């Protein structure tokens, strides 16, 4: 079973779209939390990650960071392991 992916995002974020495309190539759909539409969820993201930028991505219970970190996991081959593919 594929790991749950949660992505804090905004509608106009290009890095969010890039992360979504990378996950789509893997056949994985992220559950998106739109922080531009819900300030309480933005506060939650900052509390959980210590970061204010988007995307912020969780795979299972692990905070992996943003798009650059996600792409780095793909380059090293670790993304499939985390996604349980």
Q: Which residues fall in each region the model found?
A:
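Thiol-based oxidoreductase modules, predominantly thioredoxin-like and allied folds used
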Residues: 28-41
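A local structural micro-motif
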Residues: 31, 53-54, 81
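Non-catalytic, surface beta->alpha helical segment in thiol-disulfide oxidoreductase systems
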Residues: 59-85
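Thiol/disulfide oxidoreductase modules built on the thioredoxin-like
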Residues: 47-53
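Local sequence-structure signature of Cys/Sec-based thiol-disulfide redox active-site neighborhoods
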Residues: 1-29
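Residue-level recognition of specific faces of alpha-helices
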Residues: 15, 44, 56, 66-69
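Short secondary-structure transition/capping segments
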Residues: 1, 42-46
């Amino acid at each position: 079973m594929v790991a749950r992916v949660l992505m804090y995002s905004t509608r106009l974020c290009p890095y969010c779209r890039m992360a979504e495309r990378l996950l789509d190539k893997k056949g994985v759909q992220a559950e998106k939390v739109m922080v531009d539409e819900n300030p309480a969820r933005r506060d939650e993201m900052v509390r959980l990650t210590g970061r204010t930028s988007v995307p912020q991505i969780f795979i299972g219970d692990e905070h992996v960071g943003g798009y650059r970190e996600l792409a780095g996991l793909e380059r090293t081959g670790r993304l499939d392991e985390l996604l349980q593919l």
